Regions:
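N-terminal membrane-proximal hinge/A-helix region immediately C-terminal to the signal-anchor transmembrane segment
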Residues: 1-96, 111, 115-123, 159, ...
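Cytochrome P450 I-helix active-site segment
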Residues: 5-12, 114, 118, 166, ...
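Conserved cytochrome P450 K-helix E-x-x-R motif and the immediately C-terminal K′/meander segment
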Residues: 16-37, 206, 293-333, 354
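Short, conserved phosphate/pyrophosphate- and ester-handling motifs at nucleotide-, phospho-/glycolipid
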Residues: 54, 257, 340
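Conserved cytochrome P450 K-helix/beta-meander segment immediately N-terminal to the heme-binding cysteine loop
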Residues: 67, 345-373
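Cytochrome P450 catalytic-core helices
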Residues: 260-285, 394-412
Length: 442
């Protein structure tokens, strides 16, 4: 297939391409692309971007052909904000960092953080009273942010850092998406939002540097992630990470771990509120497994239905946009792509494709029963990516979600407020614009 015969997404605007659609109606836009073909030409401004809608092609770029792809030009824009940590690293440097950090993020290594997350969830709910209106979107994002901060920094000197991080990270995340998609001329205009972003970005960098310096001076292993990052050594060379690299890895953990986890927690409680039968089954399972005791790591594997609820939430509200760029010429779906070509894929669009997920807008945890789940094609369900760049924090995210859901639902149920319209907002992740609910003790 010649390049000029690749189907073009409809609705492009001269000079802006499909940028307005990507900014204003991103979810509708990416889910519509499958109607055009397996490879679809999208334009961001004047930059061509090839969207992949077939799971086999997406799996190829993430696994068998991953060495032929870099992060792409759009991701390069994001590096100015999120740094050069594992989530933006490429090639040999990515392999080195992954090798250094992988032992820190195994599920057994993460199991020790169960109590940390549980205590934070308990502290959040202790402020609730019967019938209280709870801003679930804000509360769950704050819970996730505090959990990530405490998993990273457990020392007493971290208390100020946690407060700065809680204040700054949401401001930066709100700006990240626009910095990736909009021309630099537009993101450089000194608006109030831009000034807030610059201030938050500078404060976050400063507090991370201060934490690293304090840990270096005090030494020792506090059992947190920062201690382990500072101590991580290459088993062959004995090399450790520079302070600058540790800084960028800490920065990456906040950007990768906070927004998605907070949004998923909020969506879990939204879906439970919308489906009383599903909520009842979750309550019954948690009551039976915990029997009135605090949730522990050994309980997590027994919460099978709760796990399926979380998996279905990942399907419904996954990230909607990931860019890549070709490093060498290759063919995808009959389309020849020269080196330097930008491509994209959308987990959200794949997860809402009725070819792979019947009734994709229906929240159905039992679609993840083993006999049904095995019918999902490889590459069609990728909430954490796949291959060499699969999310290193997957185990931590699943532990955080399961512990938080079990801890909260053991004592409380969150009921929807009649007449409230919950709108999906796509920035880096898909999160609720506002989600007020009423807290009722169980």
């Amino acid at each position: 297939m010649a390049a000029q015969r690749v189907p073009v997404a409809p609705g492009g605007v001269p000079g802006l391409g499909h940028g307005p659609q990507l900014v204003r109606r991103p979810l509708e836009f990416v889910t519509s692309l499958r109607e055009q073909g397996d490879v679809v030409l999208v334009r961001v401004g004047r930059m061509p971007l090839y969207a992949l809608t077939d799971p086999a092609l997406v799996r190829r770029i993430l696994t068998s052909d991953h060495a032929s792809f870099g992060r792409g030009r759009l991701f390069e824009r994001g590096k100015r904000i999120v740094g050069y940590g594992l989530i933006t690293a490429e090639g040999g440097f990515h392999r080195r960092q992954r090798h250094l950090m992988q032992p820190i993020f195994t599920r057994p290594a993460m199991s020790g953080h169960t109590d940390t997350v549980r205590r934070i969830a308990v502290a959040v709910t202790q402020t609730w009273s019967p019938g209280q209106r709870v801003a679930v979107d804000s509360v769950m994002n704050d819970l996730a942010l505090t959990a990530v901060a405490r998993v990273l920094f457990s020392s007493d000197v971290a208390r100020e850092a946690v407060e700065v991080i809680r204040r700054c990270v949401p401001v930066i995340l709100r700006a990240l998406f626009k910095h990736m998609l909009l021309p630099m001329a537009l993101t450089s205009v000194p608006t109030p939002a831009r000034l807030r972003f610059r201030t938050a970005h500078a404060q976050l960098h400063t507090i991370i540097d201060q934490m690293i310096a304090a840990y270096r001076v005090e030494g020792g292993d506090r059992g947190d992630l920062l201690s382990r990052l500072l101590a991580a050594r290459d088993e062959h060379t004995g090399e450790i990470m520079s302070e600058h690299q540790v800084h960028d890895e800490v920065l990456a953990m906040f950007f990768a771990g906070v927004d998605a986890t907070g949004a998923m927690l909020a969506w879990v409680f939204h879906e439970l509120g919308q489906h009383p039968d599903i909520e009842r089954r979750v309550h019954e399972e948690i009551d039976a497994v915990l029997d009135g005791n605090p949730v522990g790591y050994s309980d997590l594997a027994k919460l099978e239905y709760t796990g399926r609820v979380i998996t279905e939430t990942f399907r419904r509200y996954s990230p909607w946009f990931f860019p890549r760029g070709t490093l060498s010429p290759l063919e995808l779906g009959g389309v020849h792509l020269p080196a330097g070509t930008d491509v994209m894929y959308s987990p959200y669009a794949l997860h809402h494709d009725p070819r792979f997920f019947p009734e994709p807008d229906c929240f159905d945890p039992d679609r993840w029963l083993p006999d049904r789940a095995k019918t999902v094609p490889r590459g069609a369900f990728i909430p954490f990516g796949a291959g060499a760049h699969r999310c290193i924090g997957e185990s931590l995210a699943v532990i955080e979600l399961t512990v938080a859901v079990a801890t909260i639902t053991a004592r409380w149920r969150l009921a929807p407020i009649a007449g409230t319209r919950v709108r999906k907002v796509a920035t880096v992740t898909v999160h609720p614009d506002r989600l007020p609910m009423i807290a009722h003790p169980r």
